[in-house]
């Protein structure tokens, strides 16, 4: 184990040696990763022929995220009944070269059966989900699991919820019973409820707990972990990479020249856009540094005060989204891997967002909002910033938890960059409103302005 620990410490020392150049170095590395990905596609090293076929196009959630042919998951179960072999998913190899992960998109309404065919055929025991059903007012994943006393039937698969509980304030753990042709299996699902799309969590702690619990539930079996978010690339890639590095550490396989850049390149060659943004790449460095520091600190008394000696990659998670001018403000002493405390974003009176009805938030100057639980009150927001949301309370509420704001982010979490993607990139559940006639979004408005009094009032 000492050799692996020495490699981990060497990695941290290299980070520390970068000093103030850290931001520029990571930006350059991520730019190189993007360039390599583009070159692989241009040279045909990573092709997407299957996903581009007319019969498969509608099975892709996003038209620009197609599975690589070289590593794509090929379904054989139920093919004799006329079902296709296609699903938007790729295998990713683990530290021992086995097919350790299936990185896939969040199911669409018409690909639910394909998703469960995948789970059943490859013996998946644990599913890691890094998104919500609705995010920023857009449908990001079809619900493929059962709810309490509401079994889900899709094709020949019957899914029943056995129990659900909160692993921590961010992670929901569900135990599902899946029955197919009179055979039943248990499948566990871990859902990260507050990871913003194209952003990062405020701290790695709960994500590391999620990965650790997934491995505990998985046991020593060879079955792959099924990992997905909405597109199955950005957040999915972060989870796969963190677990991959953790397995390197546990199996004492950290090489002396360990490079997170090389690990992400491996992921990218197997699943398109794995670790999708520079912010996610920075967060990945933060997470791995914390993992290594904790391991060194627990393994040997010679590594005392390791947190203070670690590379100052970030003062805290706010570094990822703080303007450079603000970073010049003096901060209290402490290294990157101290206990991270991030100021919470303003709470909102709205509950979790599960429906979009084009109801505007309060206009600017409307005053502060109400408090929910122990969350802070929300200030007035401009009409341009007000999202389209309706207040719909979720079925399961974690005990004593904060109400989440309209963007699906906990008041104790700092929302990351949530800028919408280009037109056509997402499935918008608000796009089906009728433009003529009356409907839920087109009600008769209250008459405005003074009106003449009724004729009866003027009679003598």
UniProtKB/Swiss-Prot annotation:
Q: Where is this region: Disordered?
A: 361-460
| Top EC class of this enzyme | hydrolase
Write down what this protein is called.
Answer: Tyrosine-protein phosphatase non-receptor type 18
The function of this protein is: Differentially dephosphorylate autophosphorylated tyrosine kinases which are known to be overexpressed in tumor tissues.
Keyword field = Cytoplasm, Hydrolase, Nucleus, Phosphoprotein, Protein phosphatase
Q: Which Pfam families match?
A: Y_phosphatase
Q: Phosphothreonine modification sites?
A: 393
What does the record list as coiled-coil region(s)?
A: none
Query: Which part of the chain is the Tyrosine-protein phosphatase domain?
Result: 26-291
Homology family: Belongs to the protein-tyrosine phosphatase family. Non-receptor class 4 subfamily.
BP GO terms, sorted: blastocyst formation; negative regulation of ERBB signaling pathway; protein dephosphorylation
Q: Which reaction does it catalyse?
A: O-phospho-L-tyrosyl-[protein] + H2O = L-tyrosyl-[protein] + phosphate
Which residues are catalytic?
229
Cellular location of this protein? Nucleus; Cytoplasm
Q: Which CDD domains match?
A: PTPc-N18 (cd14603)
Checking Gene3D superfamilies in the record gives: Protein tyrosine phosphatase superfamily (3.90.190.10)
Please provide, in alphabetical order, the Gene Ontology terms of the cellular component aspect for this entry.
cytoplasm; cytosol; nucleoplasm; nucleus
Q: In which tissues is it expressed?
A: Expressed in brain, colon and several tumor-derived cell lines.
